[in-house]
Amino acid sequence: LLENIKKVSINVKNLNEFLDKKVFEIEKHDGENRIGQVNGLAWTSVGGDVLKVEAIKIKGKGELTLTGSLGDVMKESARIAFSVIKVLIDEGKIKIPKKMILDPKTNVYDSYNLHIHVPDGATPKDGPSAGITMSTAIASVFSDKKVRSDVAMTGEIDLAGNVLPIGGLKEKLIAAYKADIKIALIPKKNYERDLKDIPDEVKDNMKIIGVKDFDEVLKYALV
């Protein structure tokens, strides 16, 4: 049997042939502000990542469509986000352009269907930490305001609009730094508790802001 064993030489050039892993790269943001497109921060098995969240509105009856291989918890977060934005619209905190009002007797969010998508659809995604990211995408769509491309965020949101703490902060902020993000919005509790664990290189080159509610998120995210 030993005679049939062949020697294999592994070096830098052929290493990828023996690794069953994709090369993990984080793209830098392109500098273009867009309506309904937000940079979220995610934790993965190979480190942090910048997760794009997209939202569009289509004339309809207030239905919500979710795509991108989202898990149950993330779908729940999207529904919570939509409810939070509805409340903010009703309270007048999110201003709706006149051109978007199809029927003055109908709530604007009942005149459109909303579609939220998280690209890289073949990759399963789950967890509550994209709550403020999805909320920002929806707010952008209904206010017709663009989202800053140099801002990224992570945080769970509840029905009262409070921003709740998340896990994997160190990895997420390192990913934001690699993507050339200038402002990272994180839950205030994480800011107070976990900022000491973040590398100085990240803290020195990126503004990290702790937010306690969604009103603060909008102040930094929309232009």
Stretches with model-predicted labels:
Residues N4-N16, K21-N39, S45-V223:
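Peripheral, non-AAA+ core regions of ATP-driven protein-machinery
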